Amino acid sequence: MVKKTAGLLVMAYGTPYREDDIERYYTHIRHGRKPPQEQIEDLKARYRAIGGLSPLAKITEEQAKRLEERLNEVQDEVEFRMYLGLKHIEPFIEDAVERMHDDGIKEAVGIVLAPHYSTFSIRSYNERAKAAAKKLGGPTIYTIDQWYDEPKFLQYWAEQVRAIFAAMPERERERAVLIVSAHSLPEKIIQAGDPYPTQLEDTAKRIADQAGVAHYAVGWQSAGQTPEPWLGPDVQDLTRQLYEERGYTSFVYAPVGFVADHLEVLYDNDIECKQVTEEIGARYYRPEMPNTNPLFIDALASVVLKRWAEEGDRHE
């Protein structure tokens, strides 16, 4: 019996591959409006501060490959073939869908490398993928709205956080706080009933409970430079507030809305948040990002296989 082939559409934000890409990348994010030159120079300086460019492109590709390998290791009913589609730089989501179509893929599971649902993120990825498939006449794409509650994903973060707190002397632990964060979005999503903020709060509670952490708070980071209000509190403001009002002197940052080392973590956390902790004389900690950790890849594989199984009747 010939094993069935299914597409694995891995979608992610994308990042500039070289400094020359920065302008066009951010122009795409801004819906075709070129960023002011001052902003471009600021972005270039941020990338240089983390070593030149973000490691995200390489990590995303490696995550997608490892996920494909893992899916084909843990079951033998179907052969998953991976296609990478990015939101703001090539290969675009539409390019990946076109390649699937050209390869004769009839069915695919689409997963976005972001755990929480929002209209700005997950929905926009999934809609672009489905629109591209509809235009081409296939494949059928089974999309995934969120996977923040996948047990192995929560386990990954709980283990990382627990290890940091366990290594602290008891007196330090008593005055330590966990800050769980994700990328801020415009506040208007709340009026639209978007579940994004609630999902982050749920994630934070589950991780703190599993890690046995008594003190935790939810913050937002990396807000866009636009006049409209964004979700808060910002993690830097939250750090100062927790220090001034609660007297915490050790801060553990878990940017769980992200899945890899990239600018928002390596700069916004490791440089900007760290500067705040240094200003107030506090300690800074940040667990390792999931990247290609086997437990995290297993979490993604579980999510994909559950979604594939939900469509089981169609596979007969």
Curated annotation (Swiss-Prot):
Single GO biological process annotation from the record: heme biosynthetic process
Annotated metabolic or biological route of this protein: Porphyrin-containing compound metabolism; protoheme biosynthesis
PROSITE patterns, alphabetized: FERROCHELATASE
Transmembrane segments: none
One Gene Ontology cellular component: cytoplasm
Organism, as annotated: Geobacillus kaustophilus (strain HTA426)
Alphabetical keyword list: Cytoplasm, Heme biosynthesis, Iron, Lyase, Metal-binding, Porphyrin biosynthesis
Record's function text: Involved in coproporphyrin-dependent heme b biosynthesis. Catalyzes the insertion of ferrous iron into coproporphyrin III to form Fe-coproporphyrin III.
Protein family membership: Belongs to the ferrochelatase family.
Binding locations of Fe(2+): 183, 264
Lineage summary: Bacteria, Bacillati, Bacillota, Bacilli, Bacillales
Name assigned to this protein: Coproporphyrin III ferrochelatase
